[in-house]
């Protein structure tokens, strides 16, 4: 593929875009399956995990809620990058998933929450699997840390008295 452009920056951007498109094509050929894009799967997973977390208690509940938050950050980041209000988007997205509308996500083209599946917005399953695996592995590694090194409170030290080591004779 021959790429030409007015400047090196344009050529570099075109090269990156072509590389990305070729890698997506490769992923679809290797595993010919698609899933809805726009953060819809992450929003649904976040909803399901929150529902499950309500049945838990203690640290397990907190960990599950934080995992749901992390998943939900994907559609919210899409919304923010599209110039949408993230709070309004989060409320609307949660409401749609609460109504059982599992394919609702962020439609950047419409600038709102929409039925992503119905709009034909998809991404390769292979990419989604790798993202989820990497994120889950990172979270699991953090959770496996048994020991926490905490800095103890520093002991209060009194200034040395005159005549003691470090003190200046005659000082009060």
Segments and roles (model prediction):
Residues 1-172:
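Extended, low-charge hydrophobic alpha-helical regions
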């Amino acid at each position: 593929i021959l790429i030409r452009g007015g400047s090196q920056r344009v050529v570099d951007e075109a090269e990156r875009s072509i590389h990305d498109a070729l890698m997506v094509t490769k992923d679809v050929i290797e595993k010919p399956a698609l899933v809805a894009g726009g953060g819809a799967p992450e929003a649904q997973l976040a909803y399901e995990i929150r529902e499950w977390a309500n049945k838990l208690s203690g640290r397990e509940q907190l960990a599950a809620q934080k995992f749901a938050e992390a998943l939900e950050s994907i559609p919210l980041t899409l919304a923010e990058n599209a110039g949408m209000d993230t709070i309004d988007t989060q409320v609307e997205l949660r409401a749609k998933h609460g109504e059982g509308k599992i394919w609702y996500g962020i439609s950047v083209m419409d600038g709102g929450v929409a039925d992503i599946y119905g709009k034909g917005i998809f991404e390769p399953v292979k990419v989604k699997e790798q993202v989820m695996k990497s994120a889950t592995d990172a979270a699991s590694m953090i959770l496996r840390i048994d020991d926490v090194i905490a800095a103890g409170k520093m002991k209060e030290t009194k200034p040395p008295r005159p005549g003691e080591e470090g003190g200046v004779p005659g000082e009060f």
